[in-house]
């Protein structure tokens, strides 16, 4: 990369990044938090945060990167994608004021508590089973890629570990105070560190728990933007340290700074992967929507589908194996835009931007329903569902649309199943006469139906 090419890339980076940052800041000042703000920050992080790191690697360590023309295409495609996304998100699809609709479901106090207990049990039981089969993989494996080898059993169980976080979110939303907020941080980060050691270096649960803690603090006004910035720097350093442990790296001096730059870029902002994909554009055989349904294969156990393909050719694996001919054992993240290019080229970038705008719009609608819900138990369930889907949005920005669709469907099914089981258990308890009246001063001040645990709302 020459200085002239760097100057051109810097100009485009400033214009596109400034455009997205301005819109995000305006939205933040208006609402403090919604999923448009969150996705916009993720988008900035994924496609723009890595540019300065790449430049330092190029000019400070003489690292060879993707040719500048493809990096330029990556920045321009990110800017165009966000513009289409933002217009879609802001387009009103129906009138603002509508007559109140009949609630689709109700939740009482016992059902809410049973729901979070079941989700926590799902996570704890699957972690325990995985541990009994494999032990602490962090101290047993020589390379991180060995996590995906045949020597590790019960890999499918990892997808259930995450449900500890929405369980703790329900606990927080049932009693929204600073004590519950701090307990959420301690509980979820401790669980994340446990899964980090057991699985062998997976940091997702730690990152998500800390991010949710910060966003809740911003919403409630318990932390300021300066505190958020300092926490972000601390999180980057912590993720770097965990990455060193994951890859068994021992570095110092300038080598440590170099390692910090490329690991931080690859962890938070794999934007160069999009440039690399665009560089190999002529080698792509467009996959259509096939990567979306192929990604569901990982959720089907082999004992249920004996002929299940051993290789799941989603957009990340197609990019890694077929386009780059890389068989190192780890898939290279194509990013959201890259996955759309794999599916259908430039046309799919525009269609994908519209679809993502509608997805984020739906999550914001559901989140607002949860905030306005008068029943505190139903509100806790709705808001924990929305915040629990944060992991899926990180997958959307980093891994692509196909990975997002399969994971969000899985999350919805398991979350809904936990709530349905909770309602069934409550019905059985109520039928057995085990639901007793709540006695105390509150009963004297409320209607008869609210004195019963089962009808508390």
Curated annotation (Swiss-Prot):
Topology of this chain in the membrane: Multi-pass membrane protein
Record gene name: wzyE
Pfam families for this protein: WzyE
Self-association and partners: Probably part of a complex composed of WzxE, WzyE and WzzE.
Keyword Ribonucleoprotein: no
Keyword Membrane annotated: yes
Predominant localisation class: membrane
Keywords per UniProt: Cell inner membrane, Cell membrane, Membrane, Transmembrane, Transmembrane helix
Pathway: Bacterial outer membrane biogenesis; enterobacterial common antigen biosynthesis
Recorded family membership: Belongs to the WzyE family.
Protein name per UniProt: Probable ECA polymerase
Subcellular location, record wording: Cell inner membrane
GO BP term, example: enterobacterial common antigen biosynthetic process
Stretches that traverse the bilayer: 3-23, 41-61, 65-85, 118-138, 154-174, 181-201, 206-226, 227-247, 340-360, 377-397, 408-428
InterPro entries reported in the protein's UniProt record: WzyE
Protein's job: Probably involved in the polymerization of enterobacterial common antigen (ECA) trisaccharide repeat units.
GO cellular component, one term: plasma membrane
HAMAP family hit by this protein: WzyE
